[in-house]
Each structure stands twice: as C-alpha cells, then as structure tokens.
C-alpha cells in the first residue's frame, strides 16, 4: 500500500511540475539528436516550422513551441513575454535539456537573445530569423525608451475592432511581411486564431523590451538570417546599430526576402539553418 501511495504521489508531483513548466506555452517534441528549440514569431504557432522540422527532425530533437494566446493555447495574464521567458528557462532546467540551440523568428528571435543574455551557460547557440533586440527603436520614430502602458488609445481601439476589421488589418500586414503569396493564407490562418488581448498587450510587452545593452552578456554564437525587403542598405544599418554591443554577431542577408524569410527563400533558409547547426 505504501508503495502504491508513493507511486501516486510521485506521479501527481510530476504532473504538477509538467503543467507549471508549460503554462505559458505548449511544446511538441519531434526527432532525436541534439536539442533545438523553435520559437515562432508574433501571432504564429509551431506550424510555421512545418517544412523546417521535416528536415531537422531527422538529425535533431526539435522542441516546437506555441505561446499562450496563439493557436489553441489558452491565454495567460500579463506580463506575457517575461512569463514565457522564465517558463522556458524553468522547462530547460527541469527537463535537464543539455544546451539546446535556439531558433526563433521575429519575436521568437528576440526571445532567443533574451534567454541567451539571461542564462549565458544554458544554451548552445542562437539562430535568429529577422529579429531585433529592440523592436520599438525600429517602429517608433525618435524612440527614447519610454514604456508603453497596456491601456492606451491604440490598444483600446484594437481591442474594440470587429473581426472583419481585425482580419483586414492582418491581411495588409501579411502582404507586406511575406512576398510569397502562396503562403499568405497559411500565415493568416495562424494569426486569426490569436487571442485578442494577447495580440494587443503581448505586442506591447515586446515593444517595451530593449535588449540593446543586455546582449553584451551573450557568450554563445549568434547567427541572424535577415530579410532585405524593402531596402537592404537600411536593413544593414539597422542591424549594425542595434548589435553594437555584440560585435561578434554573424548576419546573413536573404536577397529578395521579406520578414517571413523561411517562406520567401525556403531553400536558402534551410541550407543556412542546417549549416549553422553543425
């Protein structure tokens, strides 16, 4: 009886730990080999990596993340972004995953920088896809570091936007961020499932994160696969400015590619991912 009781208590304990570790994300593991974490960009799910994982899972253990409020994953309370970061660190330590490589698109790439700067010894390498340490500096003219409150006129407008207007806004965004029109519907199907509060407040979390100084703490290799649309010279200038504190960063520029590099230049993208995982 004592053995049975001990077994049940141990099982319940493991279930509680498992649930806590993943409250801000859902993760699926595919393949065997050296561990790789794949983080999607804002509003996207792990489906973003379908073609990539079809190849990588043959040689690597791929941990596919979908964040809270995206796809079918239940939303969480704010702060959203920092909770995800802390939970991924806890997940890595509790599962004793040995130095995974971080691959992240957009917000997922920014998250990768944050993780590597926060825990310099926990990860092996960062491969970021069109991601900056400070998105606000790119998007807000004369950005001075001021924090954006959750409750502001623009966020209220977006929360009150009807579904048709919300989808219309996303259509315009996707047309700009992906040159491959055959993939537009794939992206929109992911974005349309996003919890609205997460979409609005989670984006504010991302804009309020400035890692331009923190990246100096990163001790592992950082490789960036950057888009070049709409203007390569401007893109290069932006990356050089934002990574001034990490001079050892390696940046590869994808010609004729917008933000969704994996869709606009799939062969180039996969070749660079596989090469940099060696």
Q: What kind of region is each of these model predictions?
A:
Residues 63-103, 107, 271:
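Active-site loop/oxyanion-hole signature of alpha/beta-hydrolase fold enzymes
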Residues 126-161:
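Flexible "cap/lid" loop of the alpha/beta hydrolase fold
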Residues 29-74:
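Conserved HGGG/HGGXW glycine-rich cap/lid loop of the alpha/beta-hydrolase fold
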Residues 98-140:
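Conserved hydrolase catalytic core segment
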Residues 222-257:
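Conserved loop-alpha-helix segment in the C-terminal half of the alpha/beta-hydrolase fold
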Residues 185-211:
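Hydrophobic, aromatic-rich cap/lid helix
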Residues 1-37, 57-60, 98, 193, ...:
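Alpha/beta-hydrolase fold catalytic core
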Residues 257-266, 270:
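Catalytic histidine-centered segment of alpha/beta-hydrolase-like enzymes
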